[in-house]
Amino acid sequence: MNIENINTLGELVKSGYKSKSIKDELRENLISKMMSKETVFKGIHGYENSVIPELERAILSKHNINLLGLRGQAKTRLARLMVNLLDEYIPVVEGSEINDDPLNPISRFAKELINEKGDETPIYWLHRSERFAEKLATPDVTVADIIGDVDPIKAANLKLSYADDRVIHYGMIPRANRCIFVINELPDLQARIQVALFNILQEGDIQIRGFKLRLPLDMQFVFTANPEDYTNRGSIVTPLKDRIGSQILTHYPEDIETAKTITKQETDKASAQKEFIQVPELARDLLEQIVFEARESEFIDAKSGVSARLSITAFENLLSTAERRALLSGDSKTMIRLNDFDGIIPAITGKVELVYEGEQEGAQVVAETLIKNAIKTLFPTYFPEIKKLEKQSAETPYDDIISWFFNADEDFELLDEHTEQEYKNELDKITPLNAFLEKHQPNMNTVDGYFVKEFILWALVEFKKLSKHRFAEGTQFRDPYGNFMSGL
């Protein structure tokens, strides 16, 4: 059907166009995509076997949907991607405030226009990208905002009495007729406003200021909400929950690979930095492990959640830390160092909600602890495990490295201002590290190897095999008894 040649109601009827409800559109287009094995929700990772099948079932059932989950779980993005399941264009009566269907008008304006002009009634075609409306539920939202109200200025200009329904100013919901309408953070909507949604969800009509006005709106509602026990500002009233067809629980990525995919997708915009900053795979793993540690931490409120935005902003900070270092040292290319992870602490402290014990420790200490715990968790997946209880005489794969520090003439320091070559030269001084890497990670990329060497040193500190001291200009590593001996 060539929509460019269809500009009036008569031409639309001749074309054989048949109108259908928005929920039928979503259902039919979903079926078509599923049959052709097309990816429906592109850019959503980790939900393939959990959330997406439930969402598809809800669409097939023609339900209004509530996406329930913690912060940063792609709830709003899922709702926005549903637009791709709509028909590309639909006809609308020209001049209609509420997107009237020319074949099934519901407003007084559209009905009178069609009665007056008949087949010559002008129409225009609305693209699916314009069929998405979104409202963030805030405590100051009123019924007039979302449903509508009497407009006294309109009444005065048109010289109409308040008894005439033409004085109505429609709110966001009627104006989103034949659209997907999303209300974010539904529990924040006052209970009396939630009550105003009852009729729309069940009967599809609205009531404005006592007008006996029946508008059978055709809409797909999607709500998003945090779990009630976390949202202190309110809850979803029970009769409203009863009218929402499907409630779908979202979740965080369940493994590091999925989390890495999400972070990479969301940070690909920073391509200018990536041209001269190399990011070892281990650094990506470590960054995601920090977020996983945060979700399990006793210092962080689990009910609040740890958003996927943490790993995204932390990765951006990590790149910027390396970029700043390279600019100051004059390096044209650089790679991520473990010292650079100090730069992600502001991203962590701004994204986590601490419990009482965490407040006592302090946000900075909690963030540093998360980095240390992530190193301890990841280390055994790459290298031999360091057991807590070992016989004093037992040999370990790390003995040569530890002995090097014991016999070193001076403390080993990695300065923040080291150029790339100076950094590599310093790590190359620890000759046992090279032999250790060749034995346990023979396929390791040579350049990534320097980050891995530093990672080994940090891990040995966490397992009490070495000691580490952070000072203003960098980090100092020494034999575990070095601090004790220097104090004598």
List PLM regions with ranges.
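Conserved ASCE/P-loop NTPase catalytic core
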Residues: 2-257, 268-285, 298-302, 379-488
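Amphipathic alpha-helical interaction surfaces
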Residues: 58-61, 84-88, 203, 293, ...
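C-terminal helical "lid" subdomain and adjoining coupling/linker elements of P-loop NTPases
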Residues: 69, 273-280, 293-370
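Short connector loops/turns at beta-strand edges and beta->alpha or beta->beta junctions
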Residues: 151, 292-293
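Short alpha-helical scaffolding segments that buttress acidic/His motifs in well-ordered protein cores
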Residues: 263, 287-291
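Elongated, mostly alpha-helical coiled-coil "stalk/stator" tethers of large membrane protein machines
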Residues: 357-372, 376, 383, 396-399, ...
